[in-house]
Amino acid sequence: MNPIVKQILWIRVFLIGLGLQAMLELFRKDERAYKIMGTWVRNLGILIFMMPIILAPFDAQSRIEGILGASFRIIGIISSALGIIFIIVASKHLLKVAGSEQIPRELITDGIYGKVRNPIYTGVILLTIGWSLIWGAIYSFFIITGIVVLILLGLIKFLEEPMLKKFLGDKFLEYRKRVPMLFPLPVMVVIIALVITMIVFVATGLIPLI
């Protein structure tokens, strides 16, 4: 199978993970069922969603090698570490405020949520970028990261933010104006610069494609 097509087909696994997360809404209608199955379904959905991020870089594909690969590997380690930190810190803060159901009763604007509105998603994106770079997986860097970003933006724009706007109104709108969605501007500039650099290296043949 073409390695690019194989990377794209990982989207099927992402969708299964999202489907399990959607099932949580069914369990929420039955408090007893949610207590028994809710946590298991949520964790299974997260595990399945993370599978392409972790496994796709091991598929046959073009690799960044040599000194260039070592340099990007360092960037990947830093990005992955930051991603894990974001996920852990944001999850602990959410658990503290919202409880085991992870449904906040009011808008969370303190701590890491005062820096970015969706810090768990920020962490997932940083981890996806970093893990691909650690293994020098050029197709995963572009394709898997692209899929993850599109899915998370879709969840934010079409599901989560409309719900927050409906229930919290002006309070959420003010928070949205004040706090960036995923990345502060300097970090966004660094990520864009990284992507452009990768594109230039591919275009000039410094990173060969198979």
Please place each PLM-identified region on the residue numbering:
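Membrane-anchoring alpha-helices and their flanking helix-loop junctions
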Residues: 1-109, 123-210
